[in-house]
C-alpha cells in the first residue's frame, strides 16, 4: 500500500511484524522518502503525535487485543490526524470465505476477531475513534474500510 501513496506524502514509514513481508515490500526501486522496517504495532518506536495518517491494513482481526494497538496508533497520530483501518470482517463470510479463513489460519494468520461490519465499526467507536467514512467491499471475505478521527479524551 505504501508504494501507492508515494505521490501523496513527504515521508512514509511502512511497517510490518513480518521480516519476510518487509523484504518482499523492499523489492524494486523507491524514493528515499519511503522507509521499510519490522515493527510491533503494540510498541511503535515513534514519538507521540508523529504522523498525519496511520494506516493499519488487514491486521486488526488477526492480532490478540486489537484495542491495545488502537491505543498505540492514537499515541503516534497527530490530534487532527486520520486513522485508516480496513480489515476483513469475517463474521459475514460466504462458505468460500470460511474456507479461505481456514487456509489463512493454517498459514499462520489466525482470526482473533470475527466481526460483522457493524460490530467492527462499533469496536472502533468504543475504543475512542469517530468513524468519518466507512465502506464495505463485498467479496467471499468482506472487507470493511474505515477512516477515523480521535475522539477527544476528557
Ranges and model annotations:
Residues 53-66:
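A short SAM/SAH-binding and catalytic strip from SAM-dependent methyltransferases
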Residues 1-43:
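Class I SAM-dependent methyltransferase SAM/SAH-binding core
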Residues 84-107:
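Conserved class I S-adenosyl-L-methionine
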Residues 42-54:
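A short acidic, Gly/Pro-enriched loop at the edge of an enzyme's catalytic core
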Residues 13, 37, 55-56, 84:
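Conserved Rossmann-like nucleotide-binding pocket used by diverse enzymes
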Residues 127-129, 133-154:
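Core SAM-dependent methyltransferase catalytic element
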Residues 67-79:
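A short glycine-rich, Lys/Arg-flanked "PGG" loop and its adjoining helix->strand segment in the class I
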Residues 112-128:
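Short alpha-helix
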